[in-house]
């Protein structure tokens, strides 16, 4: 007779492994199915020519639910926090970033009137209750908060930095402000990349009896009866489980459940858009300009940061690992050559002559950063999706009503696990 697992988890990324750790510790039989050769999802780190490349820039909020949950699971988080500051770029001009008291005094980007306004806005951000913005887009909140164009541009820039979202006219003001407050409290760059988190979660899961299978692509999820699911794989292998926890995106989940799925009836659920970007991950033997470690475009939605100054990201500690990233707007038509040229040009502005010191680099023109652009009303949509199919649970960076990125993945993974444990132990 085929084995029937207590929980089958679809996806071996951050959400899946966090859930698996809680479930396995509660003596439930766990099977994680990962479609790729390597586990980790977007938290994966690739070891390329002795350099550790995350899939673009990754930072963990220092004061966050995600960090607390990972520490609760005894995950060691080794690394340091980058200093606040850096430069802002507009055309060929550079300005001191007004993100510290000294930066605010020294920047030539803002007039004295704008500096006073900016200081007031930052204080407002730290004291605001984001939940009160549930019915506002980030753009609406910015325009209500200040009428000064330069101050608005700084808020849009910080919105991109904290959420990777370059669609202020769409994105929820509540979600952006929640993440912006977290960013302002500091972030952590991890030694040897985010794979270290995944490896620890993976090992702990296996120690507690969980099983992980890679290169397993789910073709169909079939609810047979109460507490009984059949999962059909692409090679027609069949796996049975009492509960299914899906950490794949909303569209992929809907496809797995088929046209008759209750999820297909939720129009907004199937039309959710992903947060996208382009990343240029670069390793150098040295920095042409060691003082420039962080930069962002004011008009150009581009980010640059040297991560290796705060985390060990090379087998040779002297080497430099940095990321250049472009935030895509959902309406962008992506021209791969043009995007790469933009990122290289931006990097050349900040680190002129960098190619002379290049060890290796990797350009990815379109990368999914988050599987949902968080919009007004998403909380109701996500709530509606709960209990549509008893025994089917969702988690992932898109599945939390008020969080995205690692915060959404980790918190939704724990919540789904707790719901399953409560059900199975009752």
Locate the predicted segments by residue:
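Conserved Rossmann-like nucleotide-cofactor binding loop
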Residues: 15, 38, 251
């Amino acid at each position: 007779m085929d084995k029937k697992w207590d929980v089958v988890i679809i996806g071996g990324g951050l959400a899946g492994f966090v859930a698996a750790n809680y479930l396995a510790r509660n003596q439930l039989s766990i099977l994680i199915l990962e479609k790729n050769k390597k586990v980790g999802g977007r938290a994966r780190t690739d070891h390329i020519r002795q350099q550790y490349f995350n899939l673009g820039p990754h930072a963990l909020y220092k004061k966050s639910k995600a960090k607390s949950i990972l520490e609760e699971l005894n995950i060691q988080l080794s690394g340091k926090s980058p200093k606040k500051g850096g430069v802002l770029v507009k055309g060929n001009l550079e300005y001191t970033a007004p993100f510290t008291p000294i930066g605010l005094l020294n920047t030539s980007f803002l007039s004295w009137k704008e500096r006073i306004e900016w200081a007031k806005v930052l204080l407002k951000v730290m004291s605001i209750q984001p939940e009160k913005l549930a019915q506002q887009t980030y753009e609406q909140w910015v325009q209500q908060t200040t009428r000064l164009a330069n101050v608005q541009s700084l808020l849009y820039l910080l919105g991109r930095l904290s959420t990777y979202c370059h669609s202020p006219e769409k994105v929820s003001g509540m979600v952006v402000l929640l993440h912006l407050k977290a960013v302002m409290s500091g972030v952590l760059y991890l030694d040897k990349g985010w794979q270290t988190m995944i490896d620890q979660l993976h090992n702990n899961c296996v120690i507690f009896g969980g099983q992980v299978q890679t290169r397993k692509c789910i073709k169909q999820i079939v609810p047979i009866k109460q507490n009984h699911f059949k999962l059909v794989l692409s090679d027609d292998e069949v796996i049975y489980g009492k509960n299914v926890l899906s950490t794949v995106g909303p569209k992929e989940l809907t496809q797995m459940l088929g046209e008759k799925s209750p999820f297909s009836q939720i129009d907004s659920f199937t039309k959710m858009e992903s947060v996208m970007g382009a990343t240029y991950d670069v390793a150098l033997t040295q920095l042409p300009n060691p003082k420039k470690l962080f930069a962002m475009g004011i008009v150009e939605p581009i980010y640059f940061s040297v991560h290796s100054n705060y985390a060990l990201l090379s087998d040779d500690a002297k080497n430099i690992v940095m990321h250049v990233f472009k935030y895509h707007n959902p309406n962008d038509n992506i021209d791969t050559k043009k995007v790469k040229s933009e990122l290289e040009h931006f990097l050349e502005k900040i680190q002129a002559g960098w190619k002379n010191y290049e060890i290796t680099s990797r350009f990815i023109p379109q990368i999914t950063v988050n599987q949902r652009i968080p919009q007004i009303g998403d909380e109701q949509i996500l709530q509606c999706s709960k209990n549509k199919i008893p025994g089917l649970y969702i988690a992932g960076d898109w599945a939390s009503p008020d969080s995205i990125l690692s915060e959404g993945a980790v918190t939704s993974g724990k919540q789904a696990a707790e719901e399953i444990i409560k059900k199975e132990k009752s």
